[in-house]
Each structure stands twice: as structure tokens, then as C-alpha cells.
Amino acid sequence: MTVSSAPGKVYLFGEHAVVYGEPAVPCAVERRAAVTVEARDDDRIRVEASDLSLDGFTVEYGGTADRRPDVDVPASLLDAATGYIDAAVEQARDAADAPDAGFDVTIESDIPLGAGLGSSAAVVVAGIDAATRELGVELEKTELADRAYRAEYEVQDGEASRADTFCSTMGGAVRIEGDDCRRIDTPNLPFVVGFDGGAGDTGELVAGVRALREEYGFAADTVENIGDIVRRGETLLSAADPGADPTEDLLTELGRLMNFDHGLLEALGVSSRTLDNMVWAAREAGAHGAKLTGAGGGGCIVALDDTRETETALRYTAECENAFRAELDREGVRVEEA
């Protein structure tokens, strides 16, 4: 039996634009998905999902992704527990040259599903890591990140970027631009996350931005402007003292860029009333900046605030189901005690 875990993430800047080759800076945070894998004597896959929502479930099915199990659970849960695990298992089988390997898989996660915190990436990264180790193979992190990206790319019908899976694998803050992925040094960023209890449809939201970008030149310019924000933010981060507490001036400038970024994402149609209300609640509470994180449409916002004010304000905001501090996770994927 092998247990691996991987962190979720927030986007400091750059979601959606990263799909079109612009840079993005996602940051791993201390909310994790853990995947326990135990090899079987046959090629079947048994998936037990818990802590993904209020209801857990267990399914067992043949060793390929050709059939969708007939279980009465939300599609998002089913995709998390079977679609992504199937893709992770196929990558592990390929890496270990064990095409007929079967597994009992248990998923436990404290990352909200579909909320912009990289839940699927964390499950895939941890799943591949645990399954390959269970088969006696230990992957380098760069290969693990690449295989996790390929798994997400398959499940998301070619709409995935490398950002989530690379960030979850490596930990810390990373910079993504096309296939160029690398860690960057940052100070300790004081993230606060607000969750509205919902989840956007990533595929529909990405397709919506694509349609706007193809129809309107100014929408394409908006995507490029998000890339400019990322580059400016990266310049600020590179001049800061890595690992130290950030200065107020740095937080002010980063927050201003986050506010610009949210405005552009809103213009691209990927925000929502609940996300906007949480963003404004955070700003009015004194956050240096706040924006949606992830695909949008519902889910989470991220704010920069080193005080308790933003978290408290979000907890009293009607649209916010949960609010919590999310420290930067510099470790990435790791093996847990079984």
C-alpha cells in the first residue's frame, strides 16, 4: 500500500490567458488531496472517494476508462473519482510497463471540487505518484508533472494547461508559459481564500473565452493584457527577498495587479455575482487585492491580507460558504505514512 498527497493551488495571476501561451503564476497552498493505492491481483480498478463532498461513494469497474460506472452521484464527483483516476492509472501503467495492473484506490481531499483550487490536478499528481511507487517505480518530479498534465489533457478534451499539475507536483510558486515551466522564489504570501460553495464548468468557461477571443479583437487584447499583468507581477516577486515576509509596498503592488486581473477576467465573462461580492467584501475589509482563482463561474476567490480582517469579513458575507487562510506550500507532492 502506498499513500501520496499533493497540494491544491491558487492563481496569483494568469488563469485563462495561460491557455493561449501567456504566462501565469500559480502558487501551491496547504490544502491537500491524498491518494492511497494498493495493487490488486487482477486488472480492475476499485475507487473509494471520501471527503470530496458531503457524500462519499465506492465504485468498482473494469480496468479501462471505456465505461462510465452507473452510480447516483454528481458528475463532478464521478469525474474526480473515475475519469481522473483512470487517466492517472494509465500513466502509471505506462511508466511502470505494467499494462494489466489493477488497483484499489482511495481518495481523500480537503480541496473543494471544481472551485479553482486545483483539486483534479492534486488527485492526478498524487494518484500517479502513489500508483507508480506501488509498482516499484519512482518518477522524477519533472516526469511526474508531465504525465499528470497528459492525464488532465485527456480528461479535459485538450483544454488543460500545465499550470495546475506542475504547481501541485513542485510546490511553491511556479511560472508557466506554454511548455516552459519553472519554480520561482517568492516571499511568504498571505493568502486568504473565500469559497461560495459552488463550482464552475471549466470546459464551458474556457470555451466561452475562446469564442470571445475569436470574435472580438479587444477580447484577444484582454487576454494579452492579463499576460502583461503576470510579467509585471513576476518582476515584483523577483526583486523581493525569497522566503521572507513581504513588505507592505510589495503587497500593495501585487494586490493592485490582482485587482486589475480580476477586472479583466470579469470582462471575459468568467466571474459571477457571488465571486464579485466576495472580492468586494475582501477589498472593503482591507485586503491588498482580491480576485477569482481558477476557471471562475463560481468557486473561490483569493485575497492578499496578513491580518484577520479579510477572513472575518468573508465569513460574514452571505455569498461565502467558507473562508480560510492558505499558506504557501513549498513541498509539493510527497509520500505519506500508510
Language model: regions and residue ranges:
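Gly/Ser-rich oxyanion-binding loop with an adjacent helix/lid
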Residues: L78-R183
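Short Gly/aromatic-enriched secondary-structure transition segments
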Residues: G21-V29, A49-D51, G208
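Short, Gly/Pro- and small/polar-rich lid/capping loops
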Residues: M1-V19
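C-terminal nucleotide
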Residues: V3, P7, A34-G83, E90, ...
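Glycine/serine-rich anion-binding loops at beta->alpha junctions
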Residues: S5, V10, E108-A131, A287-D305
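Short secondary-structure capping/turn segments at boundaries of alpha-helices and beta-strands
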Residues: F13, G21-V25, R32-T36
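FAD-binding core of FAD-dependent oxidoreductases
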Residues: A17-G21, P26-A28, G118, G158-G171, ...
